[in-house]
């Protein structure tokens, strides 16, 4: 038996609409499902191992790439209407899933577009510039302060 790939990545957010502005409106992903679900009788909903405390409902948005060749995994953004969500985003050197990364063709141009749209870089462009004056990767913060990376992949030479 073996896993065949990553199905989805779920991110609990404080404000789903703000997160959708980032992932849909700024990054260009497509919402394929957006609904509020009653948590009563959901598998695992009462599990203290899975939830910090019992929740009444959750709002879920499945956010996909438009590229049919590289469509998976998709993102599942969840929030709990009328309830606070706990926790703080972690850094790259802390235990847990530290960030999500998206591939782009031109990181420097993409970074300039993100900054023009008001997205905060996690550092300056100089922080991401290598010895050859290339920018191949950057990190930004999503609306919940979660680190999001954009990279061009490994160099071709």
Predicted regions, residues:
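Vicinal oxygen chelate
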Residues: 2, 11, 34, 102-157
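Active-site scaffold segments
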Residues: 19, 99-102
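A short, acidic/glycine-rich surface segment
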Residues: 40-48, 83-88, 123
């Amino acid at each position: 038996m073996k896993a065949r790939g990553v199905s989805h990545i779920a991110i609990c957010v404080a404000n789903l609409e703000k997160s959708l502005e980032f992932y849909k409106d700024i990054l260009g992903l497509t919402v394929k499902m957006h609904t509020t679900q009653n948590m009563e009788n959901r598998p695992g909903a009462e599990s203290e191992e899975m939830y910090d405390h019992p929740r009444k409902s959750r709002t879920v948005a499945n956010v996909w790439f438009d590229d049919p060749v590289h469509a998976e995994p998709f993102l599942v953004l969840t929030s709990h209407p009328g309830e606070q969500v706990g926790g703080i985003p972690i850094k790259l050197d802390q235990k847990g899933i530290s960030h999500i990364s998206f591939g782009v063709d031109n990181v420097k141009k993409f970074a300039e577009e993100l900054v023009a749209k008001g997205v905060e870089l996690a550092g300056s462009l100089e922080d991401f510039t290598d010895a050859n004056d290339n920018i191949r990767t950057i990190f930004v913060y999503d609306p919940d302060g979660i680190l999001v990376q954009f990279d061009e992949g490994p160099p071709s030479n």
